[in-house]
Amino acid sequence: LGHDIEASWLLCEAAEALGESDSIRGLALKIASAASEGLAGDGSLFYEKDDAAGHFDRDRHWWVQAEAVVGFLNAWQLSGDSGWLELASDALDYILQNISDPVNGEWHWSIRADGTINLDDDKAGFWKCPYHNG
């Protein structure tokens, strides 16, 4: 689901660079809508879901939450629908309340499906870079 919401805004950036912004708007909103089906009641976006394989990872990874903010803001900019703005705000609230570590800094890698903080994976490392949460 993280890659889906990420794709919704990256496609817009690519289309804009090619001068094709209008042609991608509807598709970007459809992708954002599909990704939003993976939202939890607390405003977070689950990591990934593959219906064909019967796989549903309900962890909340740091980068997926960051991409949710950007993707839902982009959907709001494209559509003017304030519902997207609310989803972006909810995702940001989730980051601030659960992913961000105000005591020791940085963002936790993830919140597990059971609601506990994942302390096993790096808080800072190769995959954590300005691309997603800078």
Residue ranges and their predicted role:
Residues L1-G134:
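Glycan-recognition and catalytic cores of secretory/periplasmic carbohydrate-active enzymes
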